[in-house]
Curated annotation (Swiss-Prot):
NCBIfam families given in the database record: argS (TIGR00456)
Similarity-based family: Belongs to the class-I aminoacyl-tRNA synthetase family.
Motif position, 'HIGH' region: 121-131
Protein name, per record: Arginine--tRNA ligase
One GO MF term: arginine-tRNA ligase activity
Naturally occurring in which organism (per UniProt): Streptococcus agalactiae serotype III (strain NEM316)
EC number(s) per entry: 6.1.1.19
Lineage: Bacteria, Bacillati, Bacillota, Bacilli, Lactobacillales
Gene name in the database record: argS
């Protein structure tokens, strides 16, 4: 039982009419540790108990008797709890040393599936930093849900269909060189895509020609299909090379094209439920009763289906295939109206499981404050960026530890980890400005800072030749080790909070906090002094390293043992 639940259960013994969940929500962490580890404000009980909060606080403090507390005292309207540092540190250290990397593993999900729609880059366009957020947020959420007992299903819903393929075919037929495309597929296709979009801005006929080629593609025209398949195959080769470098895997690559033959069923279902309404020649579903002003456009007047029709087919397919407990869409903020419509249409179709679908939006990545755009050629490509991050990490490692073995492997872990961590430490709905120098820094709130704290602890443990043992009686009661113990004890709750909020930044901030606490401890404590507490201090080091490594793993970041 964590300390908050312990305190809540003790308070409930004194005030049985109060729900434990209410008590938990009221508990506060005092700004000053001299006021205790946790405090309970008695204001909310004044009305029911018809007493002053100060008297209620005093009554509660007097009645609580537990050997888990050093003392419980009332200060004004607050009940302040001082936890028994020695007893709790002993429990926490034994638990982590016993569980190892499985510490904080929970079975909330009971093996149920969580479908995660993530990454989803567009075929024939380079994998840019703009795609990074969906990829690393989705990957981290998969790790987090796995940790609490769910079975994540990672779906790369590739952007492999749409009018842009009409544009690309027009561009290739105008200016394309097969040899050049085969040699450098993505680079060459990007040049063609940017060039055709620039021409379309001054020549309206380009758009019409692109629409015509896309219509041919929809009708399975052999030439259009062959070009489309080629663009797709070449792009996937490049994407998979990058995913390997980022250590990201998927369970499904079913993209937009996969649902081409599954949309007729959606239209039939909507018709059978009398949900389709004609509007200016198009077919729509009205959603006003859900507070959505604009109807969902299902089929255009020219018979073309739309993005939402495809997503309806995908939602039905995923429910039937995975029977998900949750279905998460890790897609940018700008798509929020689309996902509100998607859920509302499914609700209209009487699919109550639409309540289990969640859009997990995120903010934009900018460069120098400017929005990135593939179409305009203003883009930061991931591959050269990762290479530069690894080089920067390598030069810092060379300066810090020139004799390090496996320098290249460590530089890879630090460089790739730096990019991932910087993205994930940002509150998901906020954007951030891309700054590689800040990302790869060993100072400040960065991935390398946390990795370095972990490597430093491993160095201490090697020097001491520490072997964890559950038979030892580990116990600490100094202030600085107590700050670390409280964080480690809180780790299971932190993971659940990150899952509940679909927010990996909660884990990243926890890891930064734990690394900072340990570095402070390291600066003020002679860890290797041969005295009665040396084994307890080393156990604390071991537990901290275990939790730091697991925090980083949940973010998809490696933790080298040496840096």
């Amino acid at each position: 039982m964590d300390t908050k639940h312990l305190i809540a259960s003790e308070i409930q013994k004194v005030v049985p009419d109060m729900e434990q969940s209410t008590i938990l929500s009221l508990l506060e962490t005092p700004k000053n540790s001299s006021m205790g580890d946790l405090a309970f404000p008695a204001f909310s009980l004044a009305k029911t108990l018809r007493k002053a909060p100060q008297i209620i606080a005093s009554d509660i403090a007097e009645q609580i008797k537990s050997d888990q507390f050093e003392k419980v005292e009332a200060v004004g309207p607050y009940v302040n709890f001082f936890l028994d540092k020695a007893a709790i540190s002993s429990q926490v250290l034994k638990q982590v040393l016993s569980d190892g990397s499985a510490y904080a593993t929970q079975n909330i999900g009971e093996g149920r599936n969580v479908a995660i729609d993530m990454s989803s880059p567009n075929i024939a366009k380079p994998f840019s930093i703009g795609h990074l957020r969906s990829t690393v947020i989705g990957d981290s959420l998969a790790n987090i849900f796995d940790k609490i007992g769910y079975h994540p299903v990672k779906i790369n819903h590739l952007g492999d269909w749409g009018k842009q393929f009409g544009m690309l075919i027009v561009a290739y037929k105008k200016w394309g060189n097969e040899e050049a495309v085969r040699a450098h597929p993505i680079d060459e296709l990007l040049k063609l895509y940017v060039r055709i979009n620039a021409e379309a801005e001054t020549d309206p006929s380009v758009d019409e020609e692109a629409r015509e080629w896309f219509r041919k593609l929809e009708a399975n025209d052999p030439e259009a299909t062959e070009l489309w398949q080629w663009f797709r195959d070449e792009s996937l080769l490049e994407f998979n090379r990058l995913y390997d470098q980022m250590n990201v895997t998927f369970d499904s690559y079913n993209g937009e094209a996969f649902y081409n033959d599954k949309m007729d069923e959606v239209l039939e279902l909507l018709e059978s439920k009398n949900l389709l309404v004609e509007s200016k020649g198009a077919q729509v579903v009205n959603l006003e009763k859900y507070g959505i002003e604009h109807p969902a456009l299902i089929k255009k007047s020219d018979g073309a289906t739309l993005y939402i029709t495809r997503d309806l087919a995908a939602a039905l397919y995923r429910k039937r295939t995975y029977d998900f407990a949750k279905s998460i869409y890790v897609v940018g903020n700008e798509q929020s109206a689309h996902f509100k419509q998607l859920k509302a249409v499914l609700k209209e179709m009487d699919y109550d499981w639409s309540d289990d679908m969640t859009h997990v939006p995120f903010g934009l990545v900018t460069k120098g404050g400017a929005k990135l755009s593939t179409r305009k050629g203003n883009v930061i490509l991931l591959e050269p960026t990762v290479a530069e991050a690894i080089n920067r990490a390598a030069s810092q490692i060379e300066a810090k530890n020139p004799n390090l073995a496996d320098k290249d492997k460590v530089a890879q872990a630090v460089g790739v980890g730096a990019i991932k961590f910087y993205d994930l430490k940002t509150d998901r709905t906020n954007g951030y400005d891309f700054d590689l120098e800040a990302m790869v820094s060993f100072e400040g709130e960065t991935g390398p800072y946390v990795q370095y704290a972990h490597a430093r602890i491993q160095s201490i443990l090697r020097k001491a030749n520490f072997n964890p043992s559950n038979s030892d009686n580990y116990s600490l009661n100094d202030v600085e080790s107590w700050e670390i113990i409280k964080l480690i004890q809180d780790f299971p709750r932190i993971i659940v909070r990150a899952a509940d909020n679909f927010e990996p930044s909660i884990i990243a901030k926890f890891a930064i906090n734990l690394a900072q606490c340990f570095n402070k401890y390291y600066a003020h404590t002679r860890i290797l002094d041969e005295d009665a507490e040396i084994s307890s201090r080393l156990a604390l080091c071991y537990a901290t390293a275990t939790v730091l490594k697991e925090s980083l793993r949940l973010l998809g970041v490696d933790a080298p043992n040496e840096m």
